[in-house]
UniProtKB/Swiss-Prot annotation:
Name assigned to this protein: Probable transaldolase
Known catalytic reactions: D-sedoheptulose 7-phosphate + D-glyceraldehyde 3-phosphate = D-erythrose 4-phosphate + beta-D-fructose 6-phosphate
Alphabetical list of Gene3D superfamilies matching this protein: Aldolase class I
Pathway: Carbohydrate degradation; pentose phosphate pathway; D-glyceraldehyde 3-phosphate and beta-D-fructose 6-phosphate from D-ribose 5-phosphate and D-xylulose 5-phosphate (non-oxidative stage): step 2/3
Pfam families: TAL_FSA
Keyword hit for Transferase: yes
PANTHER family according to UniProt: TRANSALDOLASE (PTHR10683:SF36)
Cell compartments where the protein resides: Cytoplasm
GO molecular function, one term: aldehyde-lyase activity
Active site (record annotation): 83 (schiff-base intermediate with substrate)
Gene encoding the protein: tal
UniProt KW keywords: Cytoplasm, Pentose shunt, Schiff base, Transferase
């Protein structure tokens, strides 16, 4: 499984990327708005830090507007992936963009049917939102299992990005089910690193080393 970072915060991206585990970044209008900066400027700066796919989302509702915005965003850097909402207009945009060689990430997917349609339209990535499904008392991981099964059955090449990740268990379950990617908030990535027994072990080693009076 690959890890993307789900943020538009430059400092978080720099810190996470330095760990050597991040393969890409996903953003959305809400994340960019939180930074209070120019959209294209933020995306451009991310592209200077991360050597991998960077998802930037369109705002228009109609496919003509989506395609126009996508073409502009794609000019920023070769690694830009265009996030397109899962709507009929979105599918039209994906169909056009895929024929132009522009990579797309279809977002706000809440069913396996939606993922299948997005992939058939030419999406490079599909992003099912597991956390938001959990929020409405639905098993969010079931959609990952369903999409993995369908894509495997028909040798569909679109990659599955597990999105709306709320905690490390979401990542673990998605990895066990075979999702290609998990896009995680910075907070969740930090939670994945930590374990109380690791901290206890480190302190015990330090104490034993100090008692023995050893040096490197």
């Amino acid at each position: 499984m690959k890890f993307f970072l789900d943020t538009a915060n430059i400092e978080e991206i720099k810190e996470a990327y330095s760990l050597g585990v991040i393969s890409g970044v996903t953003t959305n209008p809400s994340l960019v708005a939180k930074e209070g900066r120019d959209f294209k400027e933020v995306i451009r700066e991310i592209a200077e830090i991360v050597d991998g796919p960077i998802s930037a989302e369109v705002i228009s509702d109609d496919h003509e507007g989506m395609v126009k915005e996508a073409r502009e965003l794609a000019k920023i850097h070769k690694n830009i992936v265009i996030k397109i909402p899962m709507t009929a207009e979105g599918l039209k945009a994906v169909n056009i963009l895929s024929k132009e060689g522009i990579k797309t990430n279809v977002t706000l997917i809440f069913s396996a049917n939606q993922a299948l349609l997005a992939a058939r339209a030419g999406a490079t990535y599909v992003s099912p939102f597991v956390g938001r499904l959990d929020d409405i008392n639905t098993d969010g991981m079931q959609i990952i299992e369903d999409i993995v099964t369908i894509f495997t059955n028909y040798d569909i090449q679109a990659e599955i990005i597990t999105a709306s990740v709320r905690h490390p268990i979401h990542v673990l379950e998605a990895a066990k089910l075979g999702a290609h990617i998990a896009t995680v908030p910075y907070k969740v990535l930090m939670q994945m690193i930590k374990h109380p027994l690791t901290d206890i072990g480190i302190e015990r080693f330090k104490e034993d080393w100090k008692k023995a009076g050893l040096k490197i």
